[in-house]
From Swiss-Prot:
GO terms for biological process: proteasome-mediated ubiquitin-dependent protein catabolic process. This is LEC14B protein. Belongs to the WD repeat LEC14B family. It comes from the Eukaryota. It comes from Lithospermum erythrorhizon.
Amino acid sequence: MGYAMSRFETDVSVIFSSSSDSETSHDSLINKPVKNLDHEIAQLTRLRSAPHENLSRDLLVKRVLPLSTMKMLAGREANVSGRGRFSSADCCHVVSRHLPVNDPCVVDQMTSRVYLSQFSTDGSLFIAGFQGCHIRIYNVDKGWKVQNDIIAKCVRWTITDASLSPDQKFLAYASLTPIAHIVKFGSAATESHANVTDIHDGLDFSSNDDGGYSFGVFSIKFSTDGREIVAGTSDESICVYDLEADRLSLRISAHESDVNSVCFADESGHLIYSGSDDNLCKVWDRRCFNAKGKPAGILMGHLEGITFIDSRGDGRYFISNGKDQTIKLWDIRKMSSNAGGTIQSRNSEWDYRWMEYPQEARDLKHPSDLSGATYKGHSVLCTLIRCYFSPDYSTGQKYIYTGSHDANVYIYDLVTGDQVSTLQYHKATVRDCSWHPNYPMLVSSSFDGEIVKWEYRGNDEAPVQGNNQRLQR
């Protein structure tokens, strides 16, 4: 379950992702031949998360056997790799098998839905946005103490998105209005009321051409240098706000429907990815915008609207979650200059907000699908559910994980496409989830109002199974 047909047919080398009996074990992943995935990303993932080839060659009795941590430690002592130490890939090989799928613990609970939740870049802070106008910032290193409780300004329906600045001093948040806000949260006061204890500066994403039309901001992200914010709006636009100049520096009509997700492709800030309810993902190169603001390329393959986009951070690969109940992996080198192909018709009256996805549509394929891989098993209904690459530092980005309408969190193997674990605890839709950048810890947030922390069960306890049973609270 989980992996569908890809347009690539190159086989790649075996990736060692299993463990000894005393460690996490996923039998379905043990040296399974990899097919139908672009050789390059499979190889890049292997280089980031597989042990050194000398360790694999000298310490494995057979290639089908797992390479345990104990064997790797013995190999390090014997300097089998010739380096005298573990490489980052060796470390990832060990840590990435310790999936954060055990011992769910409720970090916080409120009476309103949780719409977003994310760790900071260094993992020391965690932010959660609630429908009831609260944005809470937790200090992870101090026992998840609430460091700031921000009451958002001018919220319409809910807080749609929020983003921490790279220096972790400012928080930008958005709602279904043209004006987002930015607030400095490093003050001594725990509770930050709008324009009372802290100033919530408005970031106006409207233009003089709007004619007073009101729209909402669905997605908002800081650039890596913290100088700009990119936003996707319900009036089909992508906007870039220059924080130093305090003005809107770019606004283009990007899609033919709501722009549900935007992000910078890498640290340079030159490339922007966008996903929309017009079923398309687009790539925008700010260095070569022409007068008409055309994208650098278009990636088609989804049969329904895109709910979220996450970049691998290399300016080449990204994933998207779609209302067609799939996650797709993209290589922007495969993008097209136009949206070609005809999508097979379905019931146009279907609405993902309150209807199940039509069974007859589940096997439909886009005739011009440019994606590198498709992952299935989770449910994308009711809200803009998010998906992500697992952290580079601890896993080598070898997994993809996502929330789901069925109240679970799903983890897929990037290369094999296998569904390696399903986290079951919540009672309602899991809209967002976040994997700690350094440790085997994952936090899920749900419409049941709960923020739940998952960790790896150490101490040589029972190995993690592919699917956890629902735990009694």
